[in-house]
């Protein structure tokens, strides 16, 4: 049932890489004109419809998310990103081997080679490998890095992630919940429309669990009105746990990950309010780490304002969203599947429709699966594409927007005055509100 949902989507992953530009379904006149006329930042021959050169990307931390990100990016068509360097403490030997051979993803169907002691290649594309635990010592300025994918899980606050900016990078995307109210959080499918290039140089993609939870919570709140609720994520173990009993600041995580169900904390439910502010104080939750290496499942129970609903009503709302505004982010599964069936699922969350329940007239239980590595990494790529598509060209975005809005107004005024005199192509079906809304 999953394959039916992985079609061409606004936020598309490896199975649907034909549309990854976050283009609106209804293009305004400005969108059409500027796409053709905004100058490129390179010296190459201009190509119709191409707006800017590819942005140079560095991956800091070549672990689970870093390598998943590179695989996801490699599978995208016409990506506006160019991964040019990874920072990995293991050097080229570890970077190339672990990228090529993965216990969860299998062998990478790309030609991965070691070029020299500081370079690997992926299908002939050279990627530099550096090794430094101090972001201030990384060669971001020298390499002209535009975006750093911060995947270590260490530099998640302003001062830490800000070291990449000091080293010469222009933007940082943290692949974890950010610490500090000064770093905005974006969840693709929920609040990515709030992003603009000028807002912040450091942004967060939230956690994998928040990316699973927020899309369907948004649907429930819009359709049913969430009063309050609790969440439990049954989560695969991660590298933050111990393989065998050993010291850890969290005494439960100190216990052997492959032998135990480990209750622990998660900020995922509370973090939903960062992208859906109206839900602040309404959700909370815990995590149960279990002896599986990948794929997790969220169990949400909420009280809702709307009365007299059925499980079918709830699932119908999810199906509508999955086929509409959340296509490529949310899916609905009607088959009796288990966790392994959701490995390499591109979407952020898949509703298990048979497990949806309604108790009384206002309590709803929803279960949703997610690949906490692959699905999350697809959203990191999507967010990086969003950043790239909002990147200013050789002239500032604001200057070009003002220029072309002025140009469009002149056309409309001349059309309305019937004084075109064949100097411009006739423009129809556009009103001034179309431009004011841009």
Swiss-Prot record:
Molecular functions per Gene Ontology: glyceraldehyde-3-phosphate dehydrogenase (NAD+) (phosphorylating) activity; glyceraldehyde-3-phosphate dehydrogenase (NADP+) (phosphorylating) activity; NAD binding; NADP binding
Pfam families in UniProt: Gp_dh_C, Gp_dh_N
InterPro entries: GlycerAld/Erythrose_P_DH, GlycerAld_3-P_DH_AS, GlycerAld_3-P_DH_cat, GlycerAld_3-P_DH_NAD(P)-bd, Glyceraldehyde-3-P_DH_1, NAD(P)-bd_dom_sf
Gene Ontology CC terms, in alphabetical order: chloroplast
Broad EC category: oxidoreductase
EC annotation from Swiss-Prot or TrEMBL: 1.2.1.13
Protein family according to the UniProt entry: Belongs to the glyceraldehyde-3-phosphate dehydrogenase family.
Further remarks about this protein from its record: Plants contain two types of GAPDH: cytosolic forms which participate in glycolysis and chloroplast forms which participate in photosynthesis. All the forms are encoded by distinct genes.
PANTHER family according to UniProt: GLYCERALDEHYDE-3-PHOSPHATE DEHYDROGENASE 2
Protein's name according to its UniProt entry: Glyceraldehyde-3-phosphate dehydrogenase B, chloroplastic
Source species taxonomy: Eukaryota, Viridiplantae, Streptophyta, Embryophyta, Tracheophyta
